[in-house]
């Protein structure tokens, strides 16, 4: 039996945790990079070949804009508000793009991702709170994503497979996809490209079948309109766009390309290509969300079913409304939902690896980190599936609680991100300028206020009793105090790793 020193696959690594090992990165600057002209400051002209080499991280990032939670928000917004909130979907996606571009900027400029920087930036007690909050957000999102995928499996199996069986299948095949990374990150990115393509095709097919009103659709996109009856759906559209774990994830994904951070030209060029591919990815995600919203706006807006439709019964409602056709719309919906649930579950596990590795620096092998993070989420998800398998109303209530959990966590990803990208000793010459900084904080404040409204509305309806109210008030006080601490605290991070 070999000794631990001879073990070719040790569970622990000797070196510090990194998002990607050097031999696993994609070579983006090589054969056609002119070191003399590209040097440290000159940015080479645009190249389609290089854009292709940098394409990938943005499409993994955009999955969080297409997860089952977002799809449920889309269908409810369409059924209740019709086409009237499409303009808000557009601007919410634009706000999400700004946040994700800042996350990518942080990762490219520093060579480290957000969780790693938080480990260096904050004292142990604050760092542990941030880590716990990130993990809770991830578990909440994962439950929604796995349940969404399990619902799709139940639809496609004609109800033969119960919800808990779909949960186990989803959890298992997640590792199969992550195994692709062993053959190169581009293989994993290609798999995600296929899943996004499946979503685009299925929901576009349904969009064509529904035949929505083109004038109403364009008016919904171009003319802002909001009524008192649709405020809750409007808040939901904005609130589910920014996912805490996605902010951590994108700052790590951009490090999958080999970049010399000592060459300003390379960093600038990388940021340019990442900005283009992220914008393209979120444009596609916007179209998919638009398809889902308009399908349900056309079919259910103004009907008695509008207020009762949800992710669990949406497929059957679609089947009853639009009938069978060449290929039953129920199964088209199931395929699209499965692609959304499966892809978002994988990115959730991927994000969990970076969050745990960055905050704790345990030095674990990737497969072991994936096993730990998957287990943390799958156990509560199986319990949820067993308890709520036959109750649509209970699943809707659970989904409201999980949305509330996501809303609580948003400041603990946004505030550290905005503080870090604003500090010259961390970002060097890539520090955000005063105008971008102001706009970013305004967007962050708007998102946090909107989610604060969600929390206030939720707790005003759900919190009853003296004991429960006291606990919630105490938690709220501690919550607000910690947010103030994050905003006001001076950066004390070491500068030994900062770009030059």
UniProtKB/Swiss-Prot annotation:
GO terms for cellular component: trans-Golgi network membrane; vacuolar membrane. Expressed in roots, stems, buds and leaves. Keywords: Golgi apparatus, Ion transport, Membrane, Transmembrane, Transmembrane helix, Transport. The keyword ATP-binding does not apply. It is found in: Golgi apparatus, trans-Golgi network membrane. Its main location: Golgi. It comes from the Eukaryota. InterPro entries: NRAMP_fam. The keyword Membrane applies. Signal peptide: none annotated. It is a multi-pass membrane protein. GO terms for molecular function: cadmium ion transmembrane transporter activity; manganese ion transmembrane transporter activity; metal ion transmembrane transporter activity. GO terms for biological process: defense response to bacterium; intracellular iron ion homeostasis; intracellular manganese ion homeostasis; iron ion transmembrane transport; iron ion transport; manganese ion transmembrane transport; manganese ion transport; positive regulation of reactive oxygen species metabolic process. Belongs to the NRAMP (TC 2.A.55) family. NCBIfam families: nramp, Nramp_1. This is Metal transporter Nramp3.1. It comes from Populus trichocarpa. The gene is NRAMP3.1.
């Amino acid at each position: 039996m070999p000794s631990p020193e001879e073990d070719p696959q040790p569970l622990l690594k000797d070196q510090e945790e990194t998002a990607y090992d050097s031999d696993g990165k994609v070579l983006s600057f090589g054969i056609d990079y002119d070191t003399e002209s590209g040097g440290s400051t000159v940015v080479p002209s645009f190249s389609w070949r290089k854009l292709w080499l940098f394409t990938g991280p943005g499409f993994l990032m955009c999955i969080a804009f297409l997860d089952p939670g977002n799809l449920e928000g889309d269908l409810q917004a369409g059924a209740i508000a019709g086409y009237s909130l499409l303009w808000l979907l557009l601007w919410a996606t634009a706000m999400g793009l700004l946040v994700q571009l800042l996350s990518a900027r942080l990762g490219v400029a520093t060579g480290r991702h957000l969780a790693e920087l938080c480990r260096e930036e904050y004292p142990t007690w604050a760092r542990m709170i941030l880590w716990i909050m990130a993990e809770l957000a991830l578990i909440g999102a994962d439950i929604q994503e796995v349940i969404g995928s399990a619902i799709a499996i139940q639809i496609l199996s004609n109800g033969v497979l119960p919800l808990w069986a779909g949960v186990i299948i989803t959890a298992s095949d997640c590792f199969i996809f992550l195994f692709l990374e062993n053959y190169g990150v581009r293989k994993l990115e290609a798999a995600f490209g296929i899943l996004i393509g499946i979503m685009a095709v299925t929901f576009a097919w349904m969009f064509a079948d529904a035949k929505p009103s083109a004038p109403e659709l364009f008016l919904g996109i171009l003319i802002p309109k909001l009524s008192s009856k649709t405020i809750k759906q409007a808040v939901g559209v904005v609130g589910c766009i920014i996912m805490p774990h996605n902010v951590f994830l994108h700052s790590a994904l951009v490090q999958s390309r080999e970049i010399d951070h000592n060459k300003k030209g390379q960093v600038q060029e990388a940021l340019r290509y990442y900005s283009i591919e992220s914008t393209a990815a979120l444009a596609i995600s916007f179209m998919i969300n638009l398809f889902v919203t308009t399908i349900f706006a056309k079919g259910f807006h103004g009907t008695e079913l509008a207020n009762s439709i949800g992710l669990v019964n949406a497929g059957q409602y679609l089947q009853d409304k639009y009938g069978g056709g060449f290929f039953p719309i129920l199964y088209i919906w199931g395929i699209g939902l499965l692609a959304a649930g499966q892809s978002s579950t994988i990115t959730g596990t991927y994000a969990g690896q970076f969050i745990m590795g960055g905050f704790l620096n345990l030095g674990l092998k990737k497969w072991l980190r994936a096993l730990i993070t998957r287990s943390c989420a799958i156990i509560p998800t199986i319990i949820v599936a067993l308890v709520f398998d036959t109750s649509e109303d209970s699943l809707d209530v659970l989904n409201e609680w999980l949305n509330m959990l996501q809303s609580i966590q948003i400041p603990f990803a946004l505030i550290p991100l905005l503080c870090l990208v604003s500090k010259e000793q961390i970002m060097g010459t890539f520090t955000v300028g005063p105008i971008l900084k102001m706009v970013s904080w305004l967007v962050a404040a708007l998102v946090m206020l909107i989610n604060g409204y969600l929390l206030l509305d939720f707790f005003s309806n759900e919190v009853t009793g003296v004991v429960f109210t006291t606990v919630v008030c105490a938690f709220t006080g501690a919550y607000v105090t910690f947010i103030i601490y994050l905003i006001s605290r001076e950066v004390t991070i070491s500068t030994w790793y900062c770009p030059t």
